[in-house]
């Protein structure tokens, strides 16, 4: 492969076109690959575009030419400095290009590019090349002259030169922007036109000789070659033809693409401190300053910086200064880069419009990335864990989880990080340091990002909008979480029970149900909780704070849940009405669920027994009956439950919490259902009526149990004696006869009982309490059943009728005894003589005769 012509500097600091050009022979050209040929073509065209902006090529017969020219052509295509007194060999301009370049460009498209005007280097600006006019103009900027006024770019140019001369070069090394002279990289000067004759060639202005053949329709500018016009149009349209297959980024030149691809392939320079590698030495050298040079330290938070401009930008976080304001919309920014990026919103043409949502983009890459929002395409998959991403940047950040070395370890908890800044931010959790304060409310934060997010609360800014329901959010993560409501996505699954969640935080909280972890401990009483929210709610018991106030009536509550329950008392706007019954709801989801009552739709079917349900959560709860799963465990007594609500209700037994208070008498209850039942006592409301006997009940469950008296149903069987019972509680109480269990013990006399109701009645013997008073005669009773029987004395009510003879009775026990007359049943047997009786009282009278005989 041919060696590239090396860059040569003369004593005067000038270079020529051949110093920056590369020539190949046909033999060498055939050894190049297609990609290398494309790269050579683009680099050559760029060089020609640069040289074409420096003026016309003067003929070699000019008497002054030998003193001005720096090269002449030999047969061996070597480039040499001419000797004194020797004229250069005449050559057609195209012959000077070599055999390969002649095939790349047409003669008419690049005549005049082989000029011999000298290029000058500016050492202050990194040895950049300028022609004579631009070089002298550029030097004027260093010495402070201002030969022109007007545009913002010109003012910035003069300002930057002053800053550069004054020694503040770090400003420009930080920004990374190249200096562009007033004349521009691509000047619109034309080259020679027409045929070359033997007569002396004059160097004339291309505008004067009419050499600008190519015009741009957008900017009305004129160019001498088609290639320069093409480059100019790319700047206007930002045409990006070459796409990187690794990350999807596109470029207008193959050379730019080739340089970019080194990011993915070549990383020769590795940092010994943190292991990070770079493809360019300049980037590597700049990075090393992070570890070595940090001269500028922030007095507010102690953070240090290697560059003054970074330090200056950082200080605006504490001061809140935003010096860069957009003239279009008034939005202000603390960094020039952010301001510059924002201005593109107003200036850039957006040629690429999305057919789905109408959003438009100025770059094809941005348009392509956006379309993946609609298609759901995630082309970048991690080879380590299989996770996929829609954007290469997200994929690249994720890969650091697997690849990055974590050199920075926390001395408190041992957690390690790949970046020192991440370690510093993490350590603030241990120290409690919050250096970033909000000027509006005084609240402070541990990171700048958290402060920015918080400030949107004051500004009312909600830049993240949901495409489904037009709801907007101040944080992107809130939008992502919200969108899962529409999509139904629950990406976080519990490995223990298979339950899935839309947010990772909810999964972490749920997993503590299985592990029993309670990491949040109350400093007052030592009680621990599984979530920080539960701890905060509990602490309000000690402080007496009532942070949640009702906006309607001003009543305050210590728990948010209690406030929500209270707010149901006040009528709310219910914009979703049911067409069947007129009932209204606050959300369309609640309306849809309600409509299944009318349609009878039960879309969720159990695979075990075929039973169907109208709600998915009802199916999940039902399926636990088959599996026996009880995922919710009480941390105090170890008892497990199949529903979270049942666990919450149970935990009030240990905490003695009674959040449901009666507004009439002030009595508190641990369950809302008990409060509702209690309130029926004040109102006398008994909404559930038995169709058989007309009896009224407060609860539907009580009605169902009562109806079994009429239909004779007894679904609960005792496995020990095969006796059947109407309800579950009767069975449980009966089973204690076999086990001998008497869990309710009286502290006064030591007597124990199998039923809580019997125990409560017994306690009234010691206290003398008789809460049930007859309004007719003033007689009081300790038991409600005795009071009910007594009232029938005044009313004459006899609800229990014999189906055989029609006789009625005031008590069910009297009816049971009477029925034995018809059936002949005699259940009471004398153990002495074996005689049978239909009443217990008859048995007792009979047994007394045996006792008298014995006496």
Swiss-Prot record:
> Can the keyword Ligase be found in this entry's annotation?
no
Query: For this protein, what is any one GO molecular function term?
Result: zinc ion binding
Can you supply a Gene Ontology BP term from the record? regulation of transcription by RNA polymerase II
Q: Keywords of this protein's UniProt record, alphabetized? A: Isopeptide bond, Metal-binding, Repeat, Ubl conjugation, Zinc, Zinc-finger
Q: List the disulfide bonds.
A: none
Which residue numbers delimit the C2H2-type Zn fingers?
120-142, 242-264, 269-291, 296-318, 324-346, 352-374, 380-402, 408-430, 436-458, 464-486, 492-514, 520-542, 548-570, 576-598, 604-626, 632-654, 660-682, 688-710, 716-738, 744-766, 772-794, 800-822, 828-850
Question: Domain KRAB spans what residues?
Answer: 15-91
Fetch the Gene3D superfamilies from UniProt: 6.10.140.140, Classic Zinc Finger (3.30.160.60)
Question: Record's PROSITE patterns?
Answer: KRAB, ZINC_FINGER_C2H2_1, ZINC_FINGER_C2H2_2
Report one GO cellular component. Answer: nucleus
Pfam families in alphabetical order: KRAB, zf-C2H2
- What SMART domains does the database record attribute to this sequence? KRAB, ZnF_C2H2
From the Swiss-Prot or TrEMBL record, give the protein name. Zinc finger protein 814
From what organism does this protein derive? Answer: Homo sapiens
């Amino acid at each position: 492969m041919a060696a590239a012509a090396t860059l040569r500097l003369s004593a005067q600091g000038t270079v020529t076109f051949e110093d920056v050009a590369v020539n190949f022979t046909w033999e060498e050209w055939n050894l190049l690959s297609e990609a290398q040929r494309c790269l050579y073509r683009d680099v050559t065209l760029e060089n020609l575009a640069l040289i074409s902006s420096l003026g016309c090529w003067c003929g070699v017969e000019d008497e002054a030419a030998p003193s001005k020219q720096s090269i002449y052509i030999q047969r061996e295509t070597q480039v040499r400095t001419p000797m004194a007194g020797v004229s250069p060999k005449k050559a057609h301009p195209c012959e000077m290009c070599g055999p390969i370049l002649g095939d790349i460009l047409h003669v008419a498209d690049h005549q005049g590019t082989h000029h011999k005007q000298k290029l000058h280097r500016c050492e202050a600006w990194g040895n950049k090349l300028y022609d004579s006019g631009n070089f002298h103009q550029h030097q004027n900027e260093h010495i402070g002259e201002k030969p022109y006024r007007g545009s913002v770019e010109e003012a910035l140019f003069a300002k930057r030169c002053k800053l550069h001369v004054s020694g503040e070069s770090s400003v420009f090394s930080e920004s990374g922007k190249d200096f562009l002279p007033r004349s521009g990289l691509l000047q619109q000067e034309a080259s020679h036109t027409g045929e070359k004759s033997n007569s002396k060639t004059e160097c004339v202005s291309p505008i004067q000789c009419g050499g600008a053949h190519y015009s741009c329709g957008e900017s009305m500018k004129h160019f001498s070659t088609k290639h320069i016009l093409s480059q100019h149009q790319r700047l206007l349209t930002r045409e990006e033809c070459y796409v990187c297959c690794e990350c999807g980024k596109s470029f207008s030149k193959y050379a730019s693409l080739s340089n970019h691809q080194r990011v993915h392939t070549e990383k020769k320079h590795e940092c010994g401190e943190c292991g990070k590698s770079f493809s360019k030495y300049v980037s590597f050298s700049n990075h090393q300053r992070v570890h070595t040079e940090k001269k500028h330290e922030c007095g507010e938070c102690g953070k240090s910086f290697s560059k003054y401009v970074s330090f200056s930008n950082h200080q605006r976080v504490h001061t809140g200064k935003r010096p860069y304001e957009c003239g279009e919309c008034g939005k202000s920014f603390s960094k020039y880069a952010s301001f510059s990026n924002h201005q593109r919103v107003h200036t850039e043409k957006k040629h690429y419009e999305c057919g789905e949502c109408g959003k438009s983009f100025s770059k094809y890459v941005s348009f392509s990335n956006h379309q993946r929002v609609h298609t759901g395409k995630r082309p970048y998959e991690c080879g380590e864990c299989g996770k996929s991403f829609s954007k290469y940047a997200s994929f690249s950040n994720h890969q650091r989880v697997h690849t990055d070395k974590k050199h920075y370890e926390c001395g408190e908890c041992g957690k390690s990080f790949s970046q020192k800044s991440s370690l510093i931010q993490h350590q603030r959790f241990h120290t409690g340091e919050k250096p970033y304060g909000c000027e509006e409310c005084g609240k402070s934060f541990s990171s700048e990002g958290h402060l920015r997010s918080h400030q949107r609360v004051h500004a009312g800014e909600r830049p993240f909008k949901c495409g489904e329901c037009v709801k907007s959010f101040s944080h992107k993560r809130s939008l992502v979480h919200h969108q899962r409501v529409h999509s139904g996505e629950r990406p976080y699954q519990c490995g223990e029970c298979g339950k899935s969640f839309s947010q990772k935080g909810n999964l972490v909280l749920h997993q503590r149900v299985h592990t029993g972890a309670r990491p949040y401990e109350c400093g007052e009483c030592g009680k621990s909780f599984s979530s920080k929210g539960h701890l905060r709610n509990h602490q309000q018991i000690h402080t007496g704070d009532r942070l949640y106030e009702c906006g309607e009536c001003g009543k305050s509550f210590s728990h948010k849940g209690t406030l929500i329950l209270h707010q149901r008392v006040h009528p709310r706007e219910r914009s979703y009405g049911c067409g069947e019954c007129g009932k209204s709801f606050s959300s369309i989801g609640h309306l849809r669920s309600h409509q299944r009552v009318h349609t009878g739709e039960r879309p969720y079917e159990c695979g075990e027994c075929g039973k169907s349900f109208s709600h998915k959560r009802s199916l999940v709860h039902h399926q636990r009956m088959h599996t026996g799963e009880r995922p919710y465990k009480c941390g105090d007594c170890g008892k497990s439950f199949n529903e979270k609500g049942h666990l919450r209700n149970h935990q009030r037994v240990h905490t003695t919490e009674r959040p449901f208070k009666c507004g009439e008498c002030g009595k508190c209850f641990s369950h809302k259902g008990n409060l509702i039942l209690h309130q029926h006592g004040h109102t006398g409301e008994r909404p559930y009526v038995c169709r058989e006997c007309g009896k009224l009940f407060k609860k539907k469950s009580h009605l169902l149990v009562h109806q079994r008296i009429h239909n004779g149903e007894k679904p609960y069987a005792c496995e020990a004696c095969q006796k059947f019972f109407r309800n579950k509680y009767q069975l449980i109480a009966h089973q204690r006869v076999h086990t001998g269990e008497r869990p309710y013990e009286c502290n006064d006399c030591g007597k124990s009982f199998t039923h809580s109701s019997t125990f409560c009645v017994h306690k009234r013997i010691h206290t003398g309490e008789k809460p049930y008073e007859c309004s007719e005669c003033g007689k009081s009773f300790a038991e409600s059943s005795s009071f009910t029987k007594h009232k029938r004395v005044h009313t004459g009510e006899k609800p229990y009728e014999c189906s055989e003879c029609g006789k009625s009775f005031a008590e069910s026990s009297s009816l049971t005894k009477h029925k034995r007359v018809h059936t002949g049943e005699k259940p009471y047997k004398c153990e002495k003589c074996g005689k049978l009786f239909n009443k217990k009282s008859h048995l007792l009278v009979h047994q007394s005769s045996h006792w008298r005989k014995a006496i």
